[in-house]
Design a protein with these regions (language model features):
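N-terminally biased helix-coil "hinge/interface" segments that flank
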Residues: 2-252
């Protein structure tokens, strides 16, 4: 039996709304050496992971790629975009923070988001719940009470947003840490963007937070599928600007 020649292979996985695709490329020549496509398995008991496993393993088997050959795996997905289109989004709870006096009065109004309409014709929207804490009252106990209140109302993810939070993120970080301890997905408004005013910053964070569960589910499913195929290199996630980051970085 002829000895198998090892090679370095880069692989890419895309989980789309209709199809899950896998492409293999020679790391040295950049030649496409294999591709595979299967239907995205939304209805499988394992979710989209089943399709990822099938496409990834098919591509490796059909092109004689061994797990040890794989030096790079990148994952991209339209699942987040599809979540908006299909209304498959999480309910958001906003924990707003501001000082007292006139500043607090104005900020409280700016922080109180209404439901975010995605498709008016069919009534698709991001449900938003709000709570407000005065900055001087901000303690771990008070934060936990407010998070619990939002969760009881139906929130699935939390947004921490403070007036002038771009100048100091300590208060938003306190809320972030409390939510993390409860294993609740959380986003800090000032971490998402520092370019906009308070309302738009909070709204942007809420939109981002609403797709966190779907995004994490897809990424985790893809990572599990890659590991099940025997590939041990870190899974890289494609960013919107064309760059990549490790899945561990994305989870942060």
């Amino acid at each position: 039996m002829a000895e198998r020649i090892s090679r370095a292979v880069r692989m890419g996985i895309d989980v789309g709304g209709t199809y899950t695709k896998c492409v293999a490329m020679d790391n040295e020549t950049h030649e496409i050496i294999g591709k595979n496509q299967v239907k995205t398995t939304h209805d499988d008991k394992s979710g989209v992971a089943a399709g990822v496993v099938k496409s990834f393993q098919n591509c490796m088997r059909e092109n004689n790629i061994a797990p040890e050959d794989v030096v790079f795996v990148a994952h991209s997905t339209t699942q987040a975009t599809n979540a908006f289109i299909e209304g498959d989004v999480a309910s958001v709870g906003v924990v707003g923070v501001a000082g007292g006096g006139l500043e607090g009065f104005l900020a409280k109004r700016q922080l109180a988001l209404k439901d975010i309409v995605l498709d008016e014709k069919v009534g698709r929207m991001i449900k938003v719940y709000n709570t407000f804490i005065k900055k001087k009252m901000l303690t771990e106990d008070v934060i936990n009470q407010n998070i619990d209140e939002l969760l009881n109302q139906g929130s699935q993810v939390i947004v921490a947003s403070m007036a002038f939070g771009v100048d100091s993120m300590d208060e938003e970080m306190m809320i972030h840490n409390c939510a993390e301890k409860k294993n609740v997905p959380v986003t800090m408004a000032s971490d998402i963007t520092k370019l906009y005013g308070l309302t738009r910053r909070t709204r942007t964070a809420a939109i981002n937070a609403s797709i966190l569960p779907k995004m994490m589910m897809t990424a985790n499913a893809t990572e599990s599928s890659v590991r099940a195929a025997g590939v041990t290199v870190p899974l890289m996630i494609m960013r919107g600007d064309g760059g990549v980051m490790e899945i561990s970085e994305m989870r942060k």
